């Protein structure tokens, strides 16, 4: 589902109305026919479409983020795929006021970068990684990764954000990232380690074991890279469930 297939950002248009439009063959803004929904709702939709096209042409993801229901932000991905930043952090614990961020890995446009505490992980290097990103993708990042980075480094991550934990729940998948990857058939290059292992590896690195850092970084990079595979799998499943099912009715 692309943004221009979506009518749900319009105030007063819910799932039922959007699916009614789709099932009547109106699957794109350019195909809109107000007779399917009645004059009042048709006026709202036509006004929204006229307003929305310039925002889409300008690559303004924030406009659609503000108008989409929170559970539908996954629809942003197809339009903003090249400017999507997948990222994951490792820390010394769970308290973003007391514990430290140890590594942060970013996956953008096929390239993966890792920043390490004490080497190149600073507020400036973080800001550069997020620069020009139109969409963030994480797993449990709204409750964990984002608060940690904002508290620890003072970076502003107030931008469109798909936290994959929520669309996974929408599809009936619960649990942690690794268990959901397993259920969906998303494979990893490296053996799986736990969050506790990540803390232990950092402690070993601080005591002088460079190989422990190599293992931690490899694990962290896998997390970031696999977020793209998970995003695309989730998007495909939701596209089928939400869009194709309605079109077939």
Model region roles, listed by residue range:
Residues 183-249:
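Acidic, Mg2+-coordinating catalytic module of metal-dependent nucleases/exonucleases
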Residues 25, 153, 234:
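Active-site catalytic pocket residues across diverse enzymes, especially alpha/beta-hydrolases
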């Amino acid at each position: 589902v692309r943004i221009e297939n979506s009518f749900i950002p319009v105030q007063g248009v819910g799932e039922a109305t959007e699916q009614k439009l789709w099932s009547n063959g109106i699957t794109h803004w350019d195909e809109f026919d107000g007779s399917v929904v009645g004059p009042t709702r048709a006026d709202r939709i036509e006004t929204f479409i006229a307003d929305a096209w310039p925002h889409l042409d300008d690559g303004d993801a924030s406009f659609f983020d503000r108008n989409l229901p929170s559970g539908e932000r996954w629809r942003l991905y197809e339009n903003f795929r090249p400017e999507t930043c997948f990222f994951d952090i490792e820390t010394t614990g769970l308290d973003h006021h007391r514990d430290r961020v140890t590594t942060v890995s970013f996956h953008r446009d096929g390239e993966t970068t890792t920043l390490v505490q004490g080497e190149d992980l600073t507020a400036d290097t973080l800001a550069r990684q997020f620069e020009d990103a139109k969409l963030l993708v994480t797993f449990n990042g709204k409750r964990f990764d984002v608060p940690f980075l904002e508290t620890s480094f003072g970076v502003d991550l107030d931008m469109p954000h798909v936290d994959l934990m929520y669309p996974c729940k929408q599809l009936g998948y619960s649990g942690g990232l690794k268990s959901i990857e397993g259920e969906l058939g998303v494979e990893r290059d490296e053996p799986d380690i736990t969050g506790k292992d990540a803390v232990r590896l950092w402690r070993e690195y601080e005591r002088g074991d460079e190989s422990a850092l190599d293992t931690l970084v490899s694990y962290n990079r896998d997390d970031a890279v696999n977020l793209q595979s998970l995003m695309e799998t989730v998007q495909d499943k939701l596209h089928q469930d939400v869009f194709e099912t309605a079109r077939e009715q």
